[in-house]
Structures are given as structure tokens and as C-alpha cells.
A protein has these predicted regions:
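Catalytic centers of hydrolytic enzymes
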Residues: 39-87, 91, 125-126, 224-240, ...
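Acidic, metal/ion-coordinating pockets
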Residues: 4, 8-17, 28-354, 403-410, ...
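C-terminal segment of classical bacterial N-terminal signal peptides
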Residues: 19-24
């Protein structure tokens, strides 16, 4: 079990007059001796980071330099440097709380991503993180995984191989020494919260008294529908309503200082140390949410700003975001009235501190990072299977590829595997999917197939963990859902469309080995596939029938350009694509040639007809799961909302 013994959760009703609170209140996380300022106010330091995404060694190149208001540029990133900066900022500030508004793990640096995010938790424990808000990526596996493995340290399938690994000191993974919260993530419509909605920390005041400081937590609206965190058993509620409800409860219990930590964001200019022209959902919320909230700390958009905004009563309060990937530590200083515990707003300050490299990296944290880098290197090189054929993404004129067929067969296999032990989401009866569909060259987004799997000069090659892990997926789950025969037919028709130049384009879908279909290469877009020419398990497609189809959550939710699938019903989530494809290779033992011929032009008239201009394949992505990194970079360069 983890080290949550320092935190006591109370359930007795009543007001907060001394160190007690109802509901999900917490005991103080630090022993505080500070901190009455010279003016008689009680100083409180709030330190926060956001959207670390497991980038322990350094920020990715695109995020490694940030620019301040005067045009000065800073090289930033890396938790070893952050640990040093945190130690400096905390010095002499005993009433100090270190927290994060989400997306600390489930990122894209290989050691964290591939090793069940356990390296990230060890680093955060060492830095003394006090608590965190659940972001969308904290739900990339399941709510049960977040609570039972990441918080409580309980092992799951593959213990000792894929999880519950020895840390840098040789200790078995024990989970986080901090707790996660969310006020608006609930178990389905009308369900109970999956995490506590808020909590109370305690601030030392004169005369041995302690003042309550409440923290409300919000998860990004729509998390359950995002590609990576697609969760059929989760619902996110309106953010303003949830925050206002919690603020009212805290005030009713005598908490007069309240902070909102929310995993939704905004953009407010390009300088990390100021703010201008704000926009975005967090900004809209900041103007409307309860005036009882004294500070708003945001995340999710991978932006950086610090500014003051008026609450609904016109009083200013800080509105901040601390970038991403370890770029920045935000510091808010609150001064509390020593009698009432209320925040003296006029004295509040906020600063975004760059996580620069002009300090000595913390040696203990450097050891942690180096340990996990070495562990990941050894892990990556482990042989999980062998291959006796090459698998290429290159498309035939009919829109097939050997890599596409391999991946479609994996998806069908994955649909028949049991859910992991922490997954409590609804699972409709019916077993495996009837067929698999995989987008090979979608018009929007990009395929989950990242690279080829090529055979070397030998007749049989080993397949390492890293080769399989990098070949397929970007951390989204496969999902099986019910669609009608009409929807399935329409999705096949949507492979063809006319582009802005009037050219017919073809964005093919790979199908699993139990499917055969032909199309009319001379027909118009929208009328190329006859139901009688689509065979699933040897039987013709019935437009009035119901089929269970497995595909990526990215495709199922319409982000690949096949909107006919969007009316799906009864979804069942499977494991993350990267993890599942590795398991498939290991289960097969040997990858053998996968024949083509699942898709053909009707009557063999491909050359004589107009099959359509194949949508170009995306560039191979050998080092970062796609499409997240590419989409983030594109959004950032255009000033748009990041994909995060």
C-alpha cells in the first residue's frame, strides 16, 4: 500500500472551526511552522506544475525553449532540475503546498509510457507532490487503474513484468504518496463520483491554530469521449455547476479560502510570465464560477500564462497555467486573515518560474531518471516473438496492405481477450467482435499503424518489445461496439470522397481475415459497395442486421473521417493499442505472412475503372506514438487548441 497514512479522511458532519471537516476532507500534508507575515497575515505558498506527461529526463524538443514577456528565451525541462528549483522555492516557506491540475502520467516518453507510468510516480513521490487533480490522461487506462494501481499500488496482470516493477532503490512499486481528486468525473449518468471531489489542507496560524484551505478539482469536460481516455463507464459533469456546488459546501463548513485546480485550459498570449487576450473554456469558467473561489489553476491546453481576472463580484483572483512537460513551476502566494482564514485578495501574487538548466540538477532525482532510462533500454530490447515475413504499410491499388491486414487481425483477436482486472466499465454480452476495421490512410488524423515491420536478411528475425510497441498504436484503446448493417455499409462507402479539386480520393479501411468484399471501381462515390458483395464470416451483409465491430476509439468517434460509425451503441473498451499489439505478438510467438485479397475490384476491373486516388500514407513515426505529438505541434504552431 502507499503512504497515504499522513492523510486522514473524515466523515463527521459539522462546520470547520478547528482541524476537522466533513466529506472528503484531508489532514494536513505538511508540518507547518511558518508563517505570519510582518503585516500579521498568514502566508501560504501554492506551487503547481501541470501536464508533465511522464517527461522525466527532458521536455521534447518542440517544448524545450519558452519565451518570456521581454523576449528572453529559456531552455527548460527535466525533473532533476525541477527538484532543485522546488527546493529553492520552498526554502523557509513551511505553509507550502505542491500540487498539479492533471495529466502527470500517460505521456509519450518511452520509459514512463511503456513501464505502466511507475517511473513518473516515483519521481513525483520524491518531489513531495501533495495532491493532484485527475486530468483526461489519468483515465487513459481505466478509473480502476488510477485508484487501485497508481494510488494504492495494487498489482495487476503481468505483475513483475509489465507492472509492479522495482524502483530505483529496489523497492516494489507501492503507488503514489498523494491522492487524486475530481468533482465532476462520475460513474456514468447519475452515478457516484469516481474520486473525492475536493479536500481541505491546513495552514498554521498564530497561537497554534490551524486555518482550513479548500481545494476543488475538475476534470476536462468530455474526457470519456476523448480518443485516449475513451471510457464507456465514465461521465464528466458541467464544470461550473460542479465547482459552484463544492464551493458552497466548503463555505457552509467554515472554509473561507478556496482554490480551484482544474484540468481544462486557455490561451493567454505567447509569453509564459504574463497573460493577455485570454480565451478558452477555462477563461469562460473563470469569469462565471463562484466568487468564493480565490484562485484558479488550470492545465490541459499546454499553454503558459499568469494573470489576474475579476470574479463575478469584480474582485481580482489569479488565473494561471504552467505550460507542460516540466517547463514551469507556478507559484501563487496567498495571505490569509489570521482570524477568519479568508484570503486578502489585494495581497495575492502569482509567478511562473521557468524550470531552467542554470542550476545543479538534484542528484537523487538524477539517479531516479537514469535508473528508469536504463531499465527501459533493457526492457525495450527484450525479444517477445519472431517474424518470418515482412509487413508493409504500402497500399495496393485495391487499398490493401500486409501491415494493415496484420493489424486488423490483431484487432479482432483483441476483441476476444478478457478485460483487465481494474476495468469496471459496462461490457455488453456477445463476446468477440464480428469483424475489425482499421483506418490505413484516413483523410483526417492518421492511422494507428506507425511503421513497417520488415524482415532482415535472415529467414527469421526476433521481434523486440520496442519494435512491436512503436509499430502500432498511440495509446488509445480498441473499442468493440454495435452498428447496423446500414452503418457498416455506409462506412465502407465513405472510403471514397471527392476532394476540393474535384478528384476522387480513396481512404481505405483494412478488414479482418473473416471479411471479403469487392467494390465497383467505375461507380460514383457513395455507390460503390453492394451489400451482397460484402461477406462477413461467409454471409452477405444485411443492412437491417446488427454487427459488433472493433476498431480504434479514434476511428469509432469519427475523428478519422468515417462518420457513419458515429451512431454506435453498447461500446466495450479493450486494452490500449500499444500494450495490446505487444501482447498479440507475444501470443502468436511467430508472425507469418498474411495474404492479401480481402478487398478487390468487382469483376477484376480495377485498371479500367476509377479506383480513386489513394490518400497518402502519413510519414512513419518511429519514435513517438501518433497522432498526438504531431497534432500538438501543429496546433501550437498555429495558435490553436492543443490535442492533449
Amino acid at each position: 500500500m502507499n503512504g497515504l497514512g499522513r492523510r486522514v479522511f473524515l466523515t463527521a458532519a459539522g462546520a470547520v472551526g478547528v482541524r476537522a471537516v466533513t466529506g472528503t476532507a484531508a489532514a494536513a500534508t505538511r508540518t507547518a511552522l511558518d508563517a505570519v507575515s510582518g503585516a500579521g497575515y498568514v502566508d501560504v505558498q501554492l506551487l503547481n506544475i501541470t501536464d508533465l506527461h511522464g517527461y522525466l529526463s527532458a521536455a521534447p524538443a518542440r517544448d524545450s525553449v519558452i519565451t518570456g514577456a521581454g523576449g528572453q528565451r529559456y531552455t527548460v525541462g527535466g525533473v532533476a532540475y525541477m527538484a532543485t528549483h522546488l527546493r529553492r522555492l520552498r526554502a523557509g516557506r513551511a505553509n507550502s503546498f505542491f500540487f498539479a491540475p492533471g495529466d502527470l502520467f500517460s505521456g509519450w516518453e518511452f520509459p514512463a509510457f511503456a513501464l505502466s507510468d511507475e517511473p513518473t510516480i516515483e519521481a513525483l513521490n520524491l518531489m513531495g507532490l501533495d495532491f493532484a487533480t485527475a486530468g483526461n490522461h489519468e483515465f487513459d487506462r481505466t478509473p480502476g487503474f488510477l485508484v487501485r494501481h497508481m494510488e494504492q499500488g495494487l498489482p495487476y496482470e503481468g505483475e513483475g513484468r509489465t507492472n509492479t516493477l522495482p524502483d530505483s532503490r529496489g523497492r516494489r512499486f507501492h503507488g503514489a504518496d498523494f491522492r487524486y481528486y475530481s468533482a465532476n468525473a462520475v460513474a456514468g449518468p447519475g452515478g457516484a463520483g469516481v474520486l473525492p471531489p475536493y479536500h481541505v489542507e491546513w495552514v498554521n496560524a498564530p497561537g497554534g491554530r490551524q486555518l482550513p484551505l479548500g481545494f476543488i478539482h475538475l476534470t476536462a469536460l468530455g474526457t470519456e469521449r476523448f480518443s485516449n481516455s475513451f471510457q464507456p463507464g465514465l461521465t464528466t459533469l458541467d464544470e461550473v455547476s460542479a465547482a459552484n456546488r463544492c464551493a458552497a459546501e466548503l463555505k457552509a463548513r467554515g472554509v473561507n479560502a478556496i482554490v480551484l485546480s482544474m484540468h481544462d485550459g486557455a490561451v493567454a498570449g505567447s509569453a509564459f510570465d504574463s497573460g493577455s487576450d485570454p480565451s478558452g473554456p477555462a477563461y469562460d469558467l473563470a469569469l462565471r464560477v463562484s466568487a468564493d473561489i480565490d484562485a484558479i489553476v488550470t492545465g490541459h491546453w499546454h499553454c503558459a500564462f499568469t494573470m489576474m481576472l475579476p470574479d463575478p463580484s469584480g474582485r481580482l483572483r489569479p488565473f494561471v497555467e504552467a505550460g507542460c512537460h516540466g517547463q514551469i513551476v507556478n507559484e501563487i502566494t496567498l495571505r490569509l486573515d489570521p482570524v477568519t482564514g479568508a484570503v486578502v485578495r489585494e495581497l495575492t501574487t502569482s509567478t511562473n518560474h521557468p524550470n531552467t538548466h542554470d542550476v545543479e540538477p538534484d542528484p537523487e532525482m538524477r539517479e531516479v531518471v537514469d535508473y528508469w532510462q536504463g531499465y527501459a533500454t533493457r526492457y525495450a530490447g527484450a525479444t517477445i516473438g519472431r517474424q518470418r515475413a515482412s509487413f508493409r504499410r504500402a497500399l495496393s491499388p485495391a487499398g490493401e496492405s500486409t501491415m494493415g491486414n496484420l493489424v486488423a487481425d490483431w484487432a479482432l483477436w483483441a476483441s476476444a481477450q478478457p478485460a483487465d482486472s481494474f476495468d469496471t466499465s459496462p461490457r455488453p454480452e456477445g463476446g468477440a467482435a464480428d469483424l475489425a476495421l482499421i483506418a490505413l490512410a484516413p483523410r483526417t488524423g492518421r492511422s494507428l499503424i506507425n511503421t513497417d515491420l520488415l524482415l532482415g536478411s535472415a529467414t527469421e528475425d526476433p521481434v523486440t518489445f520496442e519494435r512491436a510497441w512503436r509499430a502500432v498504436g498511440y495509446g488509445s484503446p480498441l473499442v468493440t461496439a454495435s452498428v447496423t448493417g446500414r452503418q457498416l455499409h455506409d462506412a465502407l462507402e465513405q472510403q471514397w470522397a471527392t476532394d476540393a479539386q474535384g478528384r476522387l480520393t480513396y481512404a481505405p479501411l483494412a478488414v479482418s481475415a473473416n471479411v471479403r468484399y469487392s467494390f465497383d471501381a467505375s461507380g460514383p462515390a457513395g455507390d460503390r459497395v453492394a451489400p451482397a458483395d460484402v461477406l462477413i464470416g461467409g454471409s452477405a451483409l444485411r443492412l437491417d442486421g446488427t454487427y459488433r465491430v472493433v476498431t480504434s476509439s479514434y476511428t469509432l468517434t469519427g475523428q478519422d473521417g468515417y462518420p457513419a460509425l458515429g451512431g454506435f451503441r453498447d461500446p466495450a473498451r479493450h486494452r490500449r493499442d500499444t500494450d495490446s499489439f505487444v501482447a498479440y505478438v507475444a501470443a502468436l510467438g511467430t508472425l507469418r505472412a498474411v495474404p492479401t485479397g480481402r478487398v478487390s475490384a468487382k469483376g477484376g476491373a480495377l485498371a479500367a475503372g476509377r479506383p480513386g486516388r489513394l490518400v497518402p500514407l502519413g510519414e512513419p513515426v518511429p519514435s513517438v506514438p501518433a497522432p498526438v505529438a504531431a497534432a500538438e505541434a501543429a496546433a501550437g504552431s498555429t495558435g490553436g487548441r492543443p490535442v492533449c
